[in-house]
């Protein structure tokens, strides 16, 4: 792995200030408090702290999350964690609002998300457009109200042996507020410097005890209205009937309009000294309006008598998310601790297209359609058992084992007939977002069974180690085993070495196996629309293009870290890692051309320009380093906190499976994985990210200043001459909070200096209309100014 000198220099700076991930405008907790936090992620030992962990782990407090200018959990995490990337793509259908996050440059579905240590269900949305996470169906982090969260634990290490499928890059464990009494109420407003994107927020939480203090209940809710932003520009290409008029601003490019509500409820009740019942639930609704590509007056996708000036379709998505976990835990007279639980998760997205038409229906076509729905359901039953044994070592040895049954369902429901109807060679379906036809819809399910065991011991006061193993059997593709070994050695109280070796896997999601639909795609450098259909890998059409049945991804990861605490006020960790992923599941390139169209028509599919499918065609290697730490300077009547973090990560495609013979036969000359897709995997995210923050805290005031440097990233269009690298950018955030009695007033600015990413080259800008790349890690909205008032009791 080659780390450029600039990255090394940045690492040195990070080492002087570095921090265990506090949010950018936060007033962080003291170093001692952070290090002494007992963790519940990555270990089954009951009293393991951050400082003692054998794996790198970050703790982001509730105060840190709420101190940023955003009501979105994923955005707040991205500002706190140098290894997390959460871009803001536009014109990408549902992905514009249900955005995926990636850890250490890997795919968003290679991160496992837990809530209170229980697996969170994924979104039903499959990301199909040219964004980070193309082909992934990830967890929607923004369905959980920030007001409900006590802290977030982020394990930056492979953990499939402990938690099962998906935990290749790491684990995000969201710990909800519990027995805390009292509560808070918060209202906020923000706006971008361009005068758009108004954001209205109202949130609160409260906790009470009941049953003579044997039980407690904590409730939280959040309401948010986000107005859209628009950074599109006028058409600057050659005059054409199939394009907007020269100078016409026909598109809307930016954040969608979102109306969101989220709530949570957590409770526990102690039935006896040995048995406690618990439950927690979350619910979220979102009404999302985004925009598709403009249809010009003379386009084959328009009827001139209906829209003489052309039209801009609107995609309206209604997202509903529900979860419930209920369980009982306790201990036996023999010293065994046990936990039995049921876990239900549900996500549904209904799609509508408005301000549109279906050309195949002629001038009498409706202008709005119901396009169908995607739906996912998760049901899990599990049992965890553990006990500490006194085997004559420095501390008891923790032995744990358990079993889990998981049932997953994924449904694709059809839309109304007009949303998908297609006649002859005419453009079919609702323009902007074509509906799901009954022929591509269906209901699918699978079962899996898992057994796990692990052992963790402190052999001496200085040396601890652990072993974990897990076996899972899936009804659709077979079984998979994974293992993990970890260790930590403390040379002194101030310096320790830690490391892990882990194998892992990720099962292909049901959406990746069965989703199929047609979408309109505009390829870089080509102003004409392409109707591209996604086919299941085991369909006749996909097999004609050389597809094979999907199998699980497998991974092998290594990490080696140094933990330093030279003083009580300074804490520093440096962790290097390598993650090899074999048979990585990716969405193939868009296979287009006359030969493709001929092949599709031979299969009875008309009006389609091309196809694509999921494939295990790629092996990747990701290498990098994380540096995090913190320093607190205690003054007479105040304190100064300095925090920082740095991540350098590079991904290399080590192998691309041989191109199927079918893509070179019958006059075809196509690549299953082309340079655009390979470039997105290797260079579509910042090579490095550095954040540094400072805050001054007194009895009444908190003043915070933070800066994040996002490294360079690149895009590779079909023509190499149009390759573009986007330069590194600094984004500065600042806030001031005044506290009096129970009230806190905050004024702040994210992206204070109104920084924008480098602009697209003209060839990549759709004739000047798309000034910025969807890959930008901090979006392209400019400065955001906000105010917030909070009352606590």
Where in this protein do the model-derived segments appear?
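Gram-negative outer-membrane beta-barrel transporters
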Residues: 401, 571, 576-717, 788-792
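Outer-membrane beta-barrel transmembrane domain signature of Gram-negative proteins
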Residues: 305, 311-324, 333, 344, ...
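Transmembrane beta-barrel wall of Gram-negative outer-membrane proteins
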Residues: 181-184, 194-309, 313-332, 739
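Short acidic/polar hinge/loop motifs at secondary-structure boundaries
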Residues: 118-156
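N-terminal Sec signal peptide and the immediately downstream disordered periplasmic leader
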Residues: 1-78, 141-144, 203-208, 268-273, ...
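C-terminal beta-signal and adjacent terminal beta-strands/loops
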Residues: 123, 650-651, 706-716, 737-793
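N-terminal periplasmic accessory domains that precede
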Residues: 73-76, 80, 101, 114, ...
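Extracytoplasmic beta-strand/coil segments of soluble accessory domains associated
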Residues: 77-124
């Amino acid at each position: 792995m080659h780390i450029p000198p600039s990255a090394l220099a940045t690492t040195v700076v990070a080492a002087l200030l570095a921090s265990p991930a506090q949010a950018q405008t936060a007033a962080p907790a003291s170093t001692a408090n952070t290090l002494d936090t007992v963790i519940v992620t990555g270990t089954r030992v009951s009293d393991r702290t951050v400082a003692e962990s054998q794996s790198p782990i970050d703790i982001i407090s509730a105060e840190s999350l709420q101190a940023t200018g955003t009501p979105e959990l994923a955005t707040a995490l991205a500002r706190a964690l140098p290894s997390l990337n959460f871009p803001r793509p536009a014109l990408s259908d549902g992905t514009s609002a249900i955005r995926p996050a990636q850890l250490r440059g890997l795919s968003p579905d290679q991160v496992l998300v837990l809530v209170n240590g229980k697996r969170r269900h994924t979104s039903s949305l499959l990301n199909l457009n040219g964004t980070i996470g193309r082909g992934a169906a990830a967890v929607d982090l923004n369905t959980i109200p920030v007001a409900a969260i006590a802290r977030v634990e982020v394990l930056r290490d492979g953990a499939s042996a402990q938690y099962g499928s998906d935990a290749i890059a790491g684990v995000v464990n969201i710990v909800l507020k519990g027995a805390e009494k009292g509560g808070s109420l918060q209202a906020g407003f923000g706006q971008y410097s361009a005068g758009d994107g108004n954001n209205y927020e109202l949130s609160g939480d409260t906790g009470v005890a009941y049953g003579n203090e044997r039980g407690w209940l904590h409730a939280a809710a959040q309401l948010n209205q986000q107005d859209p932003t628009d950074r599109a520009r006028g058409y600057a290409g050659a005059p054409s009937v199939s394009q907007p008029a020269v100078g016409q601003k026909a598109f809307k490019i930016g954040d969608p309009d979102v109306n969101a509500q989220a709530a949570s409820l957590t409770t526990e009740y102690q039935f006896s000294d040995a048995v406690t019942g618990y439950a927690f639930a979350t619910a979220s609704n979102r009404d999302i309006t985004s925009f598709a590509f403009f249809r010009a007056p003379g386009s084959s996708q328009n009827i001139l008598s209906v829209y003489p000036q052309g039209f801009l379709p609107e995609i309206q998505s209604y997202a509903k998310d529900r979860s419930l976990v209920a369980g009982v835990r306790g201990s036996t007279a023999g010293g065994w601790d046990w936990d039995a639980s049921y876990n239900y998760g549900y996500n549904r997205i209904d799609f509508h297209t408005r301000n549109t038409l279906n050309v195949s229906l002629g001038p009498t076509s409706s202008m709005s359609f119901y396009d169908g729905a995607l739906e996912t359901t998760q049901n899990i039953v599990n049992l965890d058992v553990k006990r500490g044994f006194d085997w004559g070592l420095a501390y008891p040895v923790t032995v744990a084992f358990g079993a889990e049954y998981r049932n997953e369902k994924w449904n694709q429901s059809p839309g109304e007939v007009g949303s998908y109807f297609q006649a002859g060679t005419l453009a079919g379906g609702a323009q902007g977002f074509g509906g799901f036809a009954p022929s591509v819809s269906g209901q699918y399910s699978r079962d899996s069974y898992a057994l796990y065991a692990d052992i963790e011991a402190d052999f001496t006061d200085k040396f601890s180690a652990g072993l974990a193993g897990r076996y899972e059997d899936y009804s659709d593709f077979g079984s998979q085993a994974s293992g993990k070994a970890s260790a930590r050695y403390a040379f002194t109280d101030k310096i320790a070495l830690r490391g892990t070796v882990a194998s892992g896997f990720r099962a292909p999601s049901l959406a990746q196996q069965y989703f199929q639909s047609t979408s309109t795609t505009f390829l870089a450098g080509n102003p004409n629309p392409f109707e591209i259909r996604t086919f299941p890998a085991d369909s006749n059409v996909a097999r004609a293009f050389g597809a094979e049945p999907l199998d699980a991804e497998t991974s092998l990861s290594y990490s080696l870290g140094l933990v330093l605490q030279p003083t009580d006020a300074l804490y520093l960790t440096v962790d290097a890692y390598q993650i090899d992923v074999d048979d990585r599941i990716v969405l193939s390139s868009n296979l287009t051309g006359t030969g493709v169209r001929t092949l599709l028509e031979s299969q009875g599919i008309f009006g389609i320009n091309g196809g694509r499918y999921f494939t295990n065609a790629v092996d990747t290697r990701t290498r990098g380093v994380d540096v995090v730490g913190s320093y607190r300077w205690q003054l007479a009547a105040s304190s100064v906190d300095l925090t920082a973090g740095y991540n350098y990560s590079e991904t290399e495609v080590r192998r691309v499976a041989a191109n199927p013979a079918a893509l070179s036969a019958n006059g075809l000359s196509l690549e299953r994985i082309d340079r655009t897709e390979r470039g997105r995997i290797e260079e579509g995210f910042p090579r490095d990210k550095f954040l540094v923050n400072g805050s001054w805290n007194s009895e009444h005031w908190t003043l915070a200043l933070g800066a994040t440097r996002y490294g360079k990233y690149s895009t590779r269009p079909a023509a190499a001459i149009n390759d573009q690298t986007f330069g590194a950018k600094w984004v500065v955030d600042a806030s001031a909070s005044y506290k009096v009695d129970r009230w806190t007033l905050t004024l702040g600015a994210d992206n204070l200096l109104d920084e924008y990413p480098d602009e697209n080259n003209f060839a990549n800008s759709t004739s000047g209309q798309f000034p910025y790349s969807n890959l930008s890690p901090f979006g392209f909205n400019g400065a955001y100014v906000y105010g917030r008032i909070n009352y606590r009791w």
